[in-house]
Swiss-Prot record:
It comes from Natranaerobius thermophilus (strain ATCC BAA-1301 / DSM 18059 / JW/NM-WN-LF). Keywords: Cell membrane, Membrane, Transmembrane, Transmembrane helix. PANTHER family: UPF0756 MEMBRANE PROTEIN YEAL. The lineage of its organism: Bacteria, Bacillati, Bacillota, Clostridia, Natranaerobiales. GO terms for cellular component: plasma membrane. The chain crosses the membrane at residues 5-25, 52-72, 85-105, 111-131. Belongs to the UPF0756 family. This is UPF0756 membrane protein Nther_1957. The keyword Manganese does not apply. Its main location: membrane. The keyword Cytoplasm does not apply. It is a multi-pass membrane protein.
Length: 149
């Protein structure tokens, strides 16, 4: 049990250093859950947590359509502009990478710590913004596969 505590505290601390509130909150919640009856939820989160997260993210992204904030004419104007077409292409690439990221995180969950550390370095020293872990994992998956690692 000691190593789980150390890993969760490490993730929490590096997330705080990197100002990644979502990862810090997740680390803190998992730490609290570890010492409560909620630890019974861990198998479910391991098995279905990524799908649940993607569902919530998808609901968030599609809500403007359901609320009537984005109209069909908005979609058409997006497809007629160069910036809109680049955005569509970027969405396709990001979705492709995310698919590979999900598979990598399922098969090799230990890479999450590397993604967090990389995000902190990029945000702290390269004036970047921490990327979504699934897209970052997708990029890592493509590189790992390309390098046969």
């Amino acid at each position: 049990m000691f190593h789980e505590i150390v890993v969760l505290l490490f993730i929490f601390l590096i997330a705080l250093i990197g100002k990644n509130d979502l990862v810090a909150t997740a680390g803190a919640l998992l730490f609290v859950m570890k010492f409560s009856p909620l630890s019974n939820v861990f198998p479910f989160l391991t098995e279905r947590g990524i799908e649940l997260g993607i569902l919530l993210l998808t609901l968030s992204v599609l809500t403007p359509f359901a609320a009537g904030d984005i109209m069909p004419r908005d979609l058409l104007s997006t497809l007629k502009s160069p910036a809109g077409l680049i955005a569509v292409f970027s969405g396709i690439v990001a979705s492709y990478l995310t698919g590979h990221g999900v598979e990598l995180l399922r098969s090799r969950p230990e890479v999450m710590v590397g993604l967090i550390v990389g995000s902190i370095i990029g945000a702290s020293f390269l004036k970047g913004v921490p990327a979504g872990p699934l897209v970052a994992a997708g990029l890592a998956a493509v590189l790992i596969k390309s390098l046969n690692l």
